């Protein structure tokens, strides 16, 4: 009998211990396109601003546990964001272009759904469109990531507690307005951070997007104004919403989607600025973790690498500090040049040089050789006399802006493999309850499975 009670007590202790180790609050950060080198280049750049060789640490890169993961899709070595997002959301490989489904088109639920079914509040946010591939992988089931309106319908039907990002890509189709559909499903719309601050306490469920007097798409960090949403504002509002009247905990997916867009454009400084902005939002999760250290898990990873960025292009030294002279994205430079071109009066080379100096620091803070200036002048003639352009997945840029960008990158010591995704490893950084469970080389489908187990979600 005595042995029986001892055994019973040990079982009870084991059960309590297991429960105590569950993560009540889960932050799931995904830097879209943020491979190992995007992190490394950012840290090298920050150190260069201090005039030293080495790295200046990003907070998430100093988490006590770190490893890396593969990102291939079921049908391609180099994945797209839909297949990679589905892997990180559901623990299943699928074909590129598919969302929330296996490769044979069977719908599968996500870790966000498991969390909701387990009584947790759920937040899904990004700094790109809220129906883009990565966020959509956590609530939608579609054979094609381009089915934007059906994806938006499934977002409204998900019942998740908080969404944020840029507004829908295709809000109205066949007379059905997704804004109305979401409102009918109990969501309060907040246009901008100030409006969200005024509404979140009374809202049952909240969707936060850009202010109505600002462009739909949240700008790159380098182009942002004080009226635009920041990643930190998105995360702060999310924490407030998810903690409100909640004793059961939450699952909060945060995507830094603009990193991927900048890498598609092979725009090093714009990429770095968005990695830094991503890090700033993670600091809020770290502050939360410090208040709830025995109940919180933070996972920071990526869906894939974009661009094949490398710190080094031949010489054994870098000049990354030159990048600080870039003041806007290549997309924004293109808009400046297009505005000049719309003015029918012929613009002189000196007019163009002024734009390139203001935008990239070229000619003034970044000295150019005669041959380098000649290369830009040839691009100027091709762009202004003709219509030379460079296209990537998300934008079409002036060939002159692209050439100036490439020149600054090269002088800084940055090289790119392409303007598309690569099959490179992605980082995994963890801190908090169960963080030690992420070890060894991982497959991306392992990450949601490990996370769900640590959090005790019911599938």
PLM segments and residue spans:
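Sec/Tat signal peptide C-region and signal peptidase I cleavage site
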Residues: 15-20
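A post-motif C-terminal structural segment
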Residues: 24-25, 34-40, 44-86, 135-459
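Structural beta-sheet core signal
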Residues: 28-29, 124, 300
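Sec-dependent N-terminal signal peptides
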Residues: 4-14
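Active-site-adjacent structural elements in enzyme catalytic domains
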Residues: 22-26, 33, 37-38, 43, ...
């Amino acid at each position: 009998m005595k042995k029986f009670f001892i055994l019973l007590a040990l079982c009870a202790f084991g059960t309590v211990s297991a429960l105590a180790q569950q993560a009540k609050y889960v932050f799931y950060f995904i830097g879209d396109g943020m491979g190992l080198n995007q992190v490394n280049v950012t840290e090298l750049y920050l150190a260069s601003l201090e005039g030293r060789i080495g790295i200046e640490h990003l907070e998430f890169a100093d988490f006590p546990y770190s490893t890396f993961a593969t990102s291939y899709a079921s049908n391609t070595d180099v994945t797209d964001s839909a297949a990679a997002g589905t892997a990180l959301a559901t623990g299943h490989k699928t074909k590129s272009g598919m969302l929330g489904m296996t490769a044979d088109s069977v719908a599968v639920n996500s870790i966000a759904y498991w969390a909701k079914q387990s009584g947790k509040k759920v937040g899904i946010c990004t700094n790109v469109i809220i129906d883009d591939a990565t966020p959509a992988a956590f609530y939608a089931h579609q054979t094609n990531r381009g089915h934007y309106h059906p994806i938006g319908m499934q977002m409204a039907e998900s019942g998740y507690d908080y969404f944020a990002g840029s507004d829908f890509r295709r809000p109205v189709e066949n007379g059905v307005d997704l804004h109305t559909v979401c409102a009918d499903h109990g969501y309060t719309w907040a246009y901008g951070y100030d409006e969200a601050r005024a509404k979140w306490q009374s809202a049952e469920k909240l969707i936060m997007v850009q202010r109505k007097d600002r462009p739909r798409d949240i700008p790159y960090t380098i182009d942002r104004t004080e009226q635009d949403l920041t990643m930190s504002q998105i995360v702060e509002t999310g924490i407030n919403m998810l903690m409100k009247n909640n004793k059961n905990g939450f699952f909060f997916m945060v995507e830094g989607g603009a990193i991927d867009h900048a890498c598609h454009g092979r725009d090093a400084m714009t990429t770095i600025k968005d990695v830094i902005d991503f890090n700033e939002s993670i600091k809020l999760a770290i502050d939360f973790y410090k208040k709830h250290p025995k109940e919180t898990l933070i996972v920071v990873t990526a869906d894939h690498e974009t661009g094949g960025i490398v710190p080094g292009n031949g010489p054994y030294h870098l000049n990354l500090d030159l990048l600080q002279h870039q003041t806007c994205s290549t997309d924004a430079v293109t808009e400046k040049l297009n505005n000049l071109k719309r003015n029918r009066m012929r613009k002189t080379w000196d007019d163009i040089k002024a734009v390139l100096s203001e935008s990239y620091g070229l000619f003034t803070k970044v000295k150019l050789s005669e041959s380098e200036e000649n290369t830009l002048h040839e691009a100027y003639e091709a762009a202004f006399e003709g219509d030379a352009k460079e296209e990537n997945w998300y934008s079409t840029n002036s060939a002159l802006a692209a050439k100036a960008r490439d020149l600054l990158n090269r002088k800084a010591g940055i090289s790119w493999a392409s303007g598309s995704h690569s099959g490179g490893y992605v980082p995994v950084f963890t801190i908090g309850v169960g963080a030690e469970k992420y070890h060894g080389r991982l497959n991306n489908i392992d990450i949601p499975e490990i996370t769900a187990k640590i959090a005790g979600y019911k599938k």
